[in-house]
Amino acid sequence: MIDTLKDRLKAKPKKWLVTGVAGFIGSNLLEELLQWDQAVVGLDNLSTGYRYNLEDVKKEVGHKKWSRFTFYEGDIRNLTDCRKACEEVDYVLHQAALASVPRSIEDPIATSQSNIDGFLNMIVAARDAGMKRFVYAGSSATYGDHPELPKREDKMGHPLSPYAVTKYVNELYADVFARTYGLECIGLRYFNVFGRRQDPNGAYAAVIPRWIDSFLNLVEPTIHGDGETSRDFCYITNAVEANLLAATTDNAEALNKVYNIAYGSRTTLNQLYQIIREEVSQYKPEAKTIEPIYGLFRQGDIRHSLADISRAKELLGYDPKFDVKQGMAESIKWYINKT
């Protein structure tokens, strides 16, 4: 299905807006769209995104494809910036956010300003620009304390962090804008996306790039808790394809819904540790002997996560190709080549 879509878009290119374009997921969306000969506008305030991600994309796609990209350094908290970025755009892929549970606990106001106020600015600008469709990044954090596994889109618990609250509010706004203004909206609840260009540095870095970086530098990684906390890890290529399918689907039944975007399998942190150590050891044999440090459980984290992806498969044609081991092999190869 994704190959058919690629051929269709190459034959008739569209203009896309990617917010958070200099970030992890945003830069990967940019790269794929440019490889598909699309015109792309990018918006980013460079607070958690980086120019070197854009430079990396430029290197990957070449000068000719790069010429189809326009970058605006702007802020989703500024409605004027959002309106400027939305001019003559067909589709929005809204990725910009402060995407960290610990950060939201430390600074709920900044998280709300970016994730709620910024989202509202963006969806208003998209509505006023006559946008065809608004696809936005949701989060599995919205499931909160609901105990059932696998997670199904219609069964929610109480949020466990300010970040989770903001992502749920996004879904409520999208639903209201769809029903009130007729704007086609699709939300993608990401489950622990990982892969190339994910930042290993800083206090709020995600576990996978942080551990890869630790192994490459022969430093003992820290596991929060007993290591039996589990997640449904989703390789970046799967998430990118989900965005493109959501933006272009002709299935009317698929519109104005939220979807779990994951692989559909569960991996504990202890298992993840072994997978990363095994992969890194192929490049750096000394990593084989490194043992983890077990620390405290992290406040606001859910204990287990596993996605039911049947809705995305049925309505969007989502078909994730990379499991956690395949994705990890690709990720580590990328990090090795960049160091």
Residue ranges of each PLM-predicted region?
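C-terminal substrate-binding subdomain of Rossmann-fold SDR/epimerase-dehydratase oxidoreductases
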Residues: 9-10, 16, 70, 215-339
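N-terminal Rossmann-like NAD(P)+-binding domain of SDR-like oxidoreductases, especially those catalyzing
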Residues: 1-193, 243, 247, 318, ...
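Short glycine/proline- and charge-enriched loop/turn segments
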Residues: 149-158, 206, 293-296, 309
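Hydrophobic alpha-helix immediately C-terminal to the catalytic Tyr-X-X-X-Lys motif of short-chain
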Residues: 169, 173, 177, 207, ...
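Short-chain dehydrogenase/reductase
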Residues: 112, 160-171, 202-209, 233, ...
